[in-house]
Amino acid sequence: MSEIIYISLNDLLIRYPELTDTIKGQYLLLLSELTYTSYIETSMFLKNVEKISEFGCIIVGIINNSSSFEIVASGTIIIEPKIIREGRNVGHIEDIVVSKEMRGKGISQKILDKLKSIAREKNCYKVILDCDDDVKKVYMKNGFNVKGFQMAEYFD
């Protein structure tokens, strides 16, 4: 197996600006293995990646071959400043996904480790995430504990 490189999506776009549409396409295809995705204009995609970079980071795992690369995994962390806990931060981990072909190879652990490292660098006192019941064991193996319940109200 080729080596997987872990890099922020923002840095990947900066490094390969001529491949923006390819990167966007691969990233959305990967996310579609996690949830519903719809078409997004390239300008909006770039704007949102930049916005997320202001408050956190999207990490992608790529297989880099000599002439091309493939995005095979991703995870996002958003940093929330808090008034409690001496003003320290909370890291919100979102959108963890590994392509079906690459699951079971420890890639999600590496993505989570990278995101937790960012959380420590950003003075977070904890990281939290929501997940479906059928994958909670993956997160428990990576140091997470079940706490409370997720609640949501969708507007669309």
Question: Where are the language model's segments positioned?
Answer:
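Conserved active-site alpha-helix within GNAT-family acetyltransferase domains
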Residues: Q109, E121, Y125-K126, D132-D156
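Conserved acetyl-CoA binding element of GNAT-fold acetyltransferases
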Residues: G87-K100, F149-E153
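Short amphipathic alpha-helix that is part of the acyltransferase structural core
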Residues: S2-S43
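A short helix-loop-beta-strand connector motif used in the catalytic cores of GNAT acetyltransferases and
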Residues: V49-G61, H92
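Conserved beta-strand in the GNAT
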Residues: G61, F69-I79, V97
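A conserved beta-turn-beta hairpin within the catalytic core of GNAT-like acetyltransferases
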Residues: E70, P81-I93, R103
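Conserved acetyl-CoA-binding loop-helix of GNAT-fold acetyltransferases
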Residues: V98, G104-S117, K141
